[in-house]
Every structure is written in C-alpha cells, then in structure tokens.
C-alpha cells in the first residue's frame, strides 16, 4: 500500500503513521505537512525507509499545481488529517481556518477526484453537530449539522464538500467524526496538556465558566485503531462516528488530572491550583457520540480504560 497522509506531523496524524507504518503491507507513507506551530519536530518514524516527508501547505496557491506529482506516486489511499483545530484560535482569527480546513480540503478533492485511489478518508470532528443539553442523548449518524464556532463551521463545510464529491463524482470518500482526543505528544494548547503543564509550573488551571461543560474523550491510539479499521474495511460513501464512551465534565476532569499527577509525583498540591475564568464565546455545553453503529460494523474494535491511559499520558509529560 502507498498511503498519503496530510497533517502527519500533527498530534493524531503522527500517531496514525506510527501505527500504520508497522504493517508489512505498507510500502510507502507520504506525509504532506506544512510544519505549522503545532507540528511535532521529533517523531519516532522519521528515519524509517518507508517514510517520506513532503513539506507542503494544502491551502497554498501552488498546491493544485502538484497534481501530476501526486499522480506519479501511485497512491492507494489518502487520509486527510491536516486542519486548524483550536477553537479559541478560530474565534480570534477565523481566516486561517477557512483557508486550511475548507480551501485545503477542496484542493485535495480536486487533485484526487480523477485518480485511481481506493479511499479518501476525511478525518473530522463531532463539533460539526453543535451542542447537546444535559438531558439530550449522544449524536448519531442522523444528527443534523449545527456548528457553533468558526472551527466547527469550517469542518462542517469540509465534510459537506467531501460528501458532495462522493455523490457528484463517485469519489471514494469516507467521513469520520471523532470526539476529543488525548494522549502523548498533544500540543500544549489543548485542555489536558494545559492542565498538566500548569500543575508542573504550580500555576492555576484556567477553568471556563463553572466547569460543567461535558466532553467525550477518546485515547488517540484508540482513534488511530478505529481509523485503520476504516482504511482496511470501511465502506466508501459512509460516515463513521468514533467516540470514547467517556463523558466527563471539565470540572471533574481537572480534579482527576490533579489527583493522578499528585499520585505520580508525590507532590501535595496545596496551592490555588485552578481558577474560574470568563467562559468561551459560544461555548458548546456538551458533546457525546453514539458508537453503537461503529462497534457493530467493527466488532474487533476495543476502547482502552480511560483513567489508565490518562495516567500514561500524564507520565509522558512529567
């Protein structure tokens, strides 16, 4: 298999490469990555003979002109991770999100719609579905798109572009929507590494609003394993919801992180270790994903134990 991965130096993309490159049936991995601020610089697979880094920006004006080059690679699969993903940044400056997440996805679709790739997997988010209240059940495959942040809107737009190419051009697209990922190598702007780094520095963890907002968490390697299942056996044209079946309020999460950190380090946390801050604009209250359909189609897929993987993650930062 020859596989092209966009955003393979990022958090989820790098974990995907780390796993997929171990397979004997993988011949070549091409990583198209712009090397943005969130890219990991030292990756465990970067000296592997199967691996090749292509420093490119999928949203750049030159990128569509690379079509013949990509055709020459004889690719079997494309997995599209590359995205601007930090909600707070999208509120401060949405333009980059429109460029990378929408224009970048469009450029990829145009490059590959007349090639012989077997599958184009577009990795997206559960935030496209908007928010749930405390009484509502999880999102499912029939949930309408109701994005509430510029980030979520840009990902919803890219999802719909992929869907339109599947219907219009018989493009071999698949869409996956995942819940919040966590694990080693995550850029420190995200909630869990923010908490860990604040504890290390003995600074208060900023908690939006009253901390009641709920997120569903999935360990990054579990997400990767789900995506490998989709790559190998997923059906073209389908949309898959991938979650961790672990809904936790932000308030409960920071206390859990604090307790694990204290246990691992032996440090008695006796300072003011968290503080309430002004809530995020348009802060979605709750995300949750119904994973029943995915588990029925892929019964071999298993989820890790949340607290165990959270402890492993904290260890990787300290």
Task: Provide a role label for each language-model segment.
Residues 157, 161, 165, 195, ...:
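Hydrophobic alpha-helix immediately C-terminal to the catalytic Tyr-X-X-X-Lys motif of short-chain
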Residues 90, 142-144, 173-184, 195-218, ...:
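A conserved pocket-lining segment of Rossmann-fold NAD(P)-dependent short-chain dehydrogenase/reductase
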Residues 1-181, 313-316:
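N-terminal Rossmann-like NAD(P)+-binding domain of SDR-like oxidoreductases, especially those catalyzing
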Residues 35, 56, 107, 199-318:
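C-terminal substrate-binding subdomain of Rossmann-fold SDR/epimerase-dehydratase oxidoreductases
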């Amino acid at each position: 298999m020859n596989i092209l991965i966009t955003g393979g130096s990022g958090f989820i993309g790098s974990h995907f490469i780390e796993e997929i490159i171990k397979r004997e049936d993988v011949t070549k991995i091409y990583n198209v990555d712009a090397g943005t601020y969130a890219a990991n610089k030292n990756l465990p697979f970067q000296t592997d003979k199967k691996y090749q880094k292509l420093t490119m920006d999928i949203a750049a004006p030159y990128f569509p002109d690379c079509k013949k080059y990509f055709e020459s690679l004889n690719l079997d699969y494309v997995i599209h991770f590359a995205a601007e993903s930090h909600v707070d940044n999208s509120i401060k400056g949405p333009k980059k999100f429109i460029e990378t997440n929408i224009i970048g996805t469009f450029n990829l679709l145009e490059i590959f719609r007349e090639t012989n790739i077997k599958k184009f997997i577009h990795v997206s988010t559960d935030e496209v579905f908007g928010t749930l209240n405390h009484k509502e059940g999880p999102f499912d495959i029939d949930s309408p798109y109701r994005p509430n942040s510029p980030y979520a809107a840009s990902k919803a737009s890219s999802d719909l572009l992929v869907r339109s190419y599947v219907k219009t051009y018989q493009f071999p697209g698949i869409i996956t929507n995942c819940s919040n990922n966590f694990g080693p190598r995550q850029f420190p702007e995200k909630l869990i590494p923010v908490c860990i780094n604040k504890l290390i520095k003995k600074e208060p963890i900023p908690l939006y609003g009253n901390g009641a907002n709920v997120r569903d968490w999935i360990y990054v390697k579990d997400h990767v394993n789900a995506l490998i299942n989709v790559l190998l056996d997923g059906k073209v044209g389908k949309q898959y919801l991938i979650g961790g079946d672990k809904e936790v309020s932000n308030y409960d999460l920071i206390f859990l992180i604090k307790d694990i950190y204290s246990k691992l380090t032996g440090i008695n946390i006796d300072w003011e270790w968290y503080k309430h801050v002004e809530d995020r604009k348009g802060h979605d209250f709750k995300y949750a994903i119904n994973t029943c359909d995915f588990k029925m189609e892929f019964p071999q897929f298993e989820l890790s134990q949340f607290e165990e993987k959270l402890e492993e993650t904290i260890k990787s930062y300290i």
